[in-house]
From Swiss-Prot:
Highest taxon of the lineage: Bacteria
InterPro entries in UniProt: Ribosomal_bL9, Ribosomal_bL9/RNase_H1_N, Ribosomal_bL9_bac/chp, Ribosomal_bL9_C, Ribosomal_bL9_C_sf, Ribosomal_bL9_N, Ribosomal_bL9_N_sf
Name assigned to this protein: Large ribosomal subunit protein bL9
Stated role: Binds to the 23S rRNA.
One term of GO molecular function: rRNA binding
Gene3D superfamilies documented for this protein: Ribosomal protein L9, C-terminal domain (3.10.430.100), Ribosomal protein L9, N-terminal domain (3.40.5.10)
UniProt keywords, alphabetically: Ribonucleoprotein, Ribosomal protein, RNA-binding, rRNA-binding
Single GO BP term: translation
Taxonomy of the source species: Bacteria, Pseudomonadati, Pseudomonadota, Gammaproteobacteria, Alteromonadales
GO cellular component annotations of the record: ribonucleoprotein complex; ribosome
Length: 150
């Protein structure tokens, strides 16, 4: 099925690209989320009329993400206190939501879906560098310090 992308989509294309995708991917994900429209003559004309508006929206989202990345870079280490054993092993773990809540409490709005923990949840005390994906083109790093609770 041929679709016109209304947003930048990783590993697929940019705004305005006409791409061929499997019908299920288009029907179940791209079309319902408003990330694409079916490629036909009428939709092509409508898209070309709205192209400037969509590009401005994407540029605004990128600017907002860049601004948030600068705020994250300016943050000192975010500290999370958690119950831990004698050898620094946590009772439980620290996941995406805990990190997002701590960063938000520190003054920069962050959603749990933006936090990237490729090795899974944190299960020990120490210093960590957490990757944050704010936008398809904007990444940031947050310094996280996990300390034992008294």
């Amino acid at each position: 099925m041929n679709v016109i992308l209304l947003d930048k989509i990783a590993n697929l294309g940019n705004l305005g690209d006409q791409v061929s995708v499997k019908a299920g991917y288009a029907r179940n994900f791209l079309l319902p989320q408003g990330k694409a429209v079916v490629a036909n003559a009428a939709n092509t004309e409508v898209f070309e009329a709205r192209r400037a508006e969509l590009e401005a929206k994407l540029a605004a989202e990128l600017a907002t993400a860049t601004e948030r990345a600068e705020k994250l870079a300016a943050l000192e280490a975010v500290v999370i206190a958690s119950k831990a054993g004698d050898e620094g092993k946590l009772f439980g773990s620290i996941g995406n939501r805990d990190i997002a809540d701590a960063v938000t409490a520190a003054g920069v709005e962050l959603a749990k879906s933006e936090v990237r923990l490729p090795l899974g949840a944190i299960r020990a005390t120490g210093e960590f560098e957490i990757d944050v994906q704010l936008h398809a083109e904007v990444k940031a790093v947050v310094k996280l310090s996990v300390v034992a609770e008294d």
